[in-house]
């Protein structure tokens, strides 16, 4: 049986969450916590169970809307992988709103570098962010800034995201996203991974 579950905070339920995950495993359900899990709440016991769950699309979803959540996601991913999980991770990533261009770019680019490391090392467990442009709840008709649309267009197309860094992405004729980095005073990598070869070089924390 396939189950799409909309609870975005099941791990906050403590022992009840443990019971539900154990039932899911015992009954062989294939599940998707569609609204994402909270990586901050993943402990050793949860990690062990999450690694055993049969996931729809072989994918676990987390949220990564701030720089601080990068550490939380990395910790949760390492714990779950430590129990034998070999599937993918899908990270909802809000861009815009309280996060300016620089913060949004550096947070998403962190996962681009991270995913590049995983792919070039032939390791399991690809990590894909999913960029969600901020929508003002008080003004739903407010136009989304062009940079948010372009960043989402780059991030959310896996076939492009896997092989093209943001500065080389061309969302339309005669425009390359390198222009955004110049505009916001961010150093442009010379070619792909020449200047940034590992996540340790991204001083994001």
Can you describe what each PLM-predicted range is?
Residues 44-48, 73-77, 102-107, 117-119:
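A short, acidic, amphipathic alpha-helical segment used as a generic capping/interface helix at domain edges
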Residues 1-76, 87-97, 126-130:
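Core AdoMet radical
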């Amino acid at each position: 049986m396939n189950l799409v579950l909309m609870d975005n905070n099941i791990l906050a339920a403590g022992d009840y969450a443990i019971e539900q995950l154990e039932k899911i495993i015992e009954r062989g359900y294939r599940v998707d916590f569609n609204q994402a899990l909270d990586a901050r709440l993943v402990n050793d016991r949860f990690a062990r169970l999450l690694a055993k769950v049969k996931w729809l699309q072989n994918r676990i979803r987390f949220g990564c809307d701030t720089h601080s959540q990068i550490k939380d996601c990395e910790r949760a991913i390492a714990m779950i992988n430590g129990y034998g999980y070999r599937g993918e991770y899908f990270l909802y990533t809000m861009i815009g709103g309280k996060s300016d261009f620089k913060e949004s770019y550096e947070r998403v680019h962190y996962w681009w570098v991270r995913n590049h490391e995983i792919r070039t090392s032939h390791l399991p467990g690809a990590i894909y962010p999913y960029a969600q442009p901020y929508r003002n709840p008080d003004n739903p008709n407010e136009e989304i800034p062009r940079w948010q649309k372009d960043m989402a267009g780059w991030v959310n197309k896996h076939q492009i995201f896997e092989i093209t860094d943001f500065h080389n992405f061309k969302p339309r004729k005669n425009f390359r996203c390198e222009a955004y980095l110049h505009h916001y005073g961010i150093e442009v990598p010379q070619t792909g991974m020449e200047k940034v070869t590992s996540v340790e070089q991204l001083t994001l924390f």
